[in-house]
């Protein structure tokens, strides 16, 4: 890639590539739920047979996954700061592979939800440690690029999941019949475990000649035993909370949206608990106005990501996109755009990093264009147009801007945070952001069931992104002077 041939392959390039693999399998595992549920709804199989409100229930399953995912965001970053980013990253991928395999083995709605929540709990610790590990081991001028390149795994995972899962179901139908929905979980879970072993072997920092590594630094140390113990304890508590809310809500006859709102309320309650118990560490992350605005900005970002990530195949199919595989092909163009958008956004972000509000201004432009493109796509399909080529182009272009803005925002948040707190900050950012992911699948599904069309959910998506633009414009970025140097930084 950029200047790679000139400088040769560096250790941080290897780290970017390995974390790309981590993102790839993480997103295949989580995005698989949407196409599988779409298949189950259409064919009325398993626990979706004779259900009156299938999209609402399917969306609720997605929201329960993201509730677990959301709750582990800050603990994941906190554990990374304590036991090492690398240890938590690798534990996350192993956990995801096992949870995915078990989802395919079990039967029944409750067991399905249980292992989707467990998947969310395991994958919830990945994000903050991945971002922090890249920031620690990359040269300052290449942090945005590194974050963007690693995140292309998101795009490839989204595309592979959107296209590959329907294909795997079709492949399995002749020998598994209505249990064909299980087959993708076996395949993706196995691939995830293979990647976990690769990360265990190769995701290691490299000593720089003349630079003494700080073995106590979270970017260097890797305490797997303690990391797994505390990760298990946090997950056990949150699993009981999430499943408890689900069982009590169902017994009380609450709607899917009501359950999602209750799950969302766990976010401020967890922040309050953390503030009371770890005030000295949490207060700076909440008192920084610019960081807080970025936390809120990521709510519509996650809403958009999982509105499309969960329901895109169903959206395209409902608006005349053909059979399941044909609709999946059109929908995949949105995720495919990230292969260009993520590294391009990261590179542009680095180019303007030294300018006053440089990253902020780029982020505002990308968000503004994306907002317009969301409304254009909504208007096109709501007027009855369904040309698959046109829809594919629209989804690809909007995806280009959507994925490009994310490494810009991540690098901006990193600029605003001291080195020792990056893991906790990214954990806090994604904790708040996952409010959007928790609400998006179920609210969108309920609105779809009540209106009979995906038109209103699309318009709601655009309105939320417009609100995100307002938040970005209120940010005034100022870099934090770092007091410690990572090996990548010390050598330059």
Write out the residue ranges for each language-model feature.
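Helix-loop-helix hairpin linking two adjacent transmembrane segments in secondary transporters
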Residues: 150, 154-204, 217-263
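Extracytoplasmic gate region of multi-pass secondary transporters
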Residues: 33-34, 234-260, 289-335, 339-343, ...
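Extracytoplasmic
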Residues: 14-48, 161, 308-313, 440
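C-terminal transmembrane helical hairpin of 12-TM major facilitator-type secondary transporters
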Residues: 357-409
């Amino acid at each position: 890639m950029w200047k790679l041939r000139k400088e040769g392959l560096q250790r941080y390039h290897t780290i970017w590539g390995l974390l790309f693999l981590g993102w790839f399998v993480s997103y295949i595992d989580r995005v698989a739920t949407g196409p599988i549920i779409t298949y189950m709804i259409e064919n009325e199989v398993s626990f979706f047979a004779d259900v009156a409100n299938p999209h609402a229930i399917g969306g609720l399953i997605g929201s329960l996954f993201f509730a677990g995912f959301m709750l582990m965001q800050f603990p994941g970053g906190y554990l990374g700061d304590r036991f090492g980013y690398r240890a938590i990253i690798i534990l996350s991928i192993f956990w995801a592979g096992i949870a995915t395999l078990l989802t395919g083995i079990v039967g029944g709605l409750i067991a399905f939800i249980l292992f989707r929540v467990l998947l969310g709990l395991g994958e919830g610790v990945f994000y903050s440690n991945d971002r922090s590990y890249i920031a620690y081991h990359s040269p300052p001028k290449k942090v945005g690029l590194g974050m963007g390149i690693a995140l292309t795994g998101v795009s490839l995972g989204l595309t592979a999941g959107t296209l590959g899962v329907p294909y795997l179901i079709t492949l399995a139908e002749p020998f598994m019949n209505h249990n064909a929905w299980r087959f993708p979980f076996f395949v993706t879970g196995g691939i995830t475990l293979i990647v976990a072993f690769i990360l265990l072997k190769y995701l290691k920092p490299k000593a720089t000649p003349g630079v003494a590594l700080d073995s106590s630094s979270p970017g260097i140390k890797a305490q797997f035993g303690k990391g797994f113990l505390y990760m298990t304890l946090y997950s056990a508590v949150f699993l009981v909370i999430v499943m408890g809310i689900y069982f009590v809500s169902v017994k009380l006859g609450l709607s899917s949206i009501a359950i999602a709102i209750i799950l969302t309320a766990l976010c401020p309650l967890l922040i309050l608990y953390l503030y009371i118990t770890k005030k000295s560490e949490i207060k700076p992350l909440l008192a920084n106005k610019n960081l807080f605005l970025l936390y809120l900005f990521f709510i519509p970002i996650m809403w958009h990501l999982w509105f499309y990530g969960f329901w895109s195949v169903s959206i395209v199919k409902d608006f005349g996109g053909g059979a399941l595989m044909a609709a999946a092909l059109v929908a995949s163009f949105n995720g495919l755009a990230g292969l260009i958008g993520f590294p391009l956004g990261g590179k542009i972000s680095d180019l303007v990093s030294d300018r006053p509000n440089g990253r902020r201004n780029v982020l505002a432009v990308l968000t503004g264009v994306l907002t317009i493109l969301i409304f254009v796509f909504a208007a096109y399909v709501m007027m009855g147009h369904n040309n698959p080529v046109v829809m594919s182009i629209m989804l690809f272009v909007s995806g280009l801007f959507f994925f490009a803005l994310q490494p810009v925002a991540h690098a901006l948040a990193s600029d605003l945070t001291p080195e020792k707190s990056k893991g906790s900050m990214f954990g806090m950012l994604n904790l708040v952001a996952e409010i959007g992911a928790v609400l998006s699948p179920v609210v969108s599904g309920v609105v779809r069931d009540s209106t009979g069309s995906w038109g209103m959910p699309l318009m709601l998506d655009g309105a939320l992104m417009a609100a995100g633009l307002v938040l970005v414009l209120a940010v005034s970025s100022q870099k934090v002077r770092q007091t410690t140097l990572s090996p990548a930084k010390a050598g330059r």
